[in-house]
């Protein structure tokens, strides 16, 4: 079984973990509908790219 030759320093450990953070969702404002939505997703009213693509259930 492999064992590290040297102890990992706090700096190296923290630099490695900088990519493990949570990202905030990409939210954009749709001016046509006056509503917020996630980028590249259908809005809650069923619109995408200014066109109706889904009927709301």
Swiss-Prot record:
Keywords: Ribonucleoprotein, Ribosomal protein. Residues 1-22 are annotated as: Disordered. The keyword Phosphoprotein does not apply. InterPro entries: Ribosomal_bL32 (IPR002677), Ribosomal_bL32_bact (IPR044957), Ribosomal_zn-bd (IPR011332). One of its GO terms (cellular component) is large ribosomal subunit. It holds the Pfam family Ribosomal_L32p. GO terms for molecular function: structural constituent of ribosome. GO terms for biological process: translation. Residues 7-20 have a biased composition (Basic residues). The keyword Nuclease does not apply. Belongs to the bacterial ribosomal protein bL32 family. This is Large ribosomal subunit protein bL32A. It comes from Enterococcus faecalis (strain ATCC 700802 / V583).
């Amino acid at each position: 079984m492999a064992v590290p030759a040297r102890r990992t320093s706090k700096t190296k450990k923290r630099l490695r973990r900088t990519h493990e953070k949570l990202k905030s969702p990409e939210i954009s404002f749709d001016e046509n509908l006056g509503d917020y939505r996630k980028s590249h997703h259908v809005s809650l009213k069923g619109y995408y790219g200014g066109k109706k693509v889904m009927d709301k259930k």
